[in-house]
Regions:
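Hydrophobic membrane-insertion alpha-helices, especially the h-region
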Residues: 15-33
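N-terminal Lys/Arg-rich, disordered targeting/topogenic segments
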Residues: 1-13
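Catalytic glycan-binding domains that act on GlcNAc-containing polysaccharides
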Residues: 30-204
Length: 204
């Protein structure tokens, strides 16, 4: 849902990340084994903050929690204060007008723009929206992620113009380069979250 503005603590995290990566590079093959280990990957690459909120609302909306984690990783880097140049807010980078529409569809009394910075509220609305997209695009994650990134209207237009059906999976055919890369990254990272966390989640 757009680029984001990083907070200072995110910048500090990147400094630590680069220091660790440099150290591993310097010690060669052994370092690469350390880098690819689950402990390092989950600590520096595939972190999962706000897991309780994600599990709760992904379950309520019957969507894949690992996909939600991947969306957040790619949208905001788990930065609750992230704001894109276009105005998308919070963990799942929800645009204010989209958030207002979601709130109305959910039957909420009112939409709270400032609350989008709160993890629980943002994830609640974002998971509902992902559930809506999953239903609309018949559980096709490629189409679902195209719609999340480029909009439902563009997705429908591309389906019509290019003869895509609900079995579409040719990511390379996506017209927007940014959306194409976004879909690749989200689906790749979803598989990594599944690999590292599937045995750590109860009742999954």
């Amino acid at each position: 849902m757009g680029r984001r503005k990083k907070k200072k603590f995110i910048d500090r995290w990147w400094v630590k990340f680069l220091m660790v990566a440099a150290a591993i590079f310097l010690i060669g093959e052994a370092g690469m084994k350390i880098w690819s280990s689950e402990a390092v990957q989950t600590r520096f690459v595939y972190m999962w903050p706000y897991q309780n909120e994600i599990l709760e609302y992904s379950s309520k909306n019957k969507i894949d929690p690992f996909l939600v984690a991947s969306v957040i990783k790619n949208e905001s880097g788990f930065d609750t204060e992230a704001v894109s140049h276009a105005g998308a807010v919070g963990l799942m980078q929800i645009m204010p007008e989209t958030g207002e529409w979601i709130a109305s569809q959910m039957g909420l009394d009112h939409f709270d723009l400032e609350a989008l910075r709160r993890p629980e509220y943002n994830v609640r609305l974002g998971c509902w929206y992902l559930g809506e997209l999953e239903y609309e695009f018949q559980r096709n994650w490629v189409l679902m992620m195209i719609a999340y990134n480029a909009g439902r209207g563009n997705t429908r237009a591309w389906m019509q113009e290019n003869g895509w059906n609900y079995d579409f999976n040719r990511i390379e055919d996506i017209p927007y380069p940014d959306t194409r890369e976004y879909v690749k990254k989200v689906l790749r990272d979803r598989d990594k979250y599944y690999l590292y966390y599937k045995n750590k989640i109860k009742n999954y």
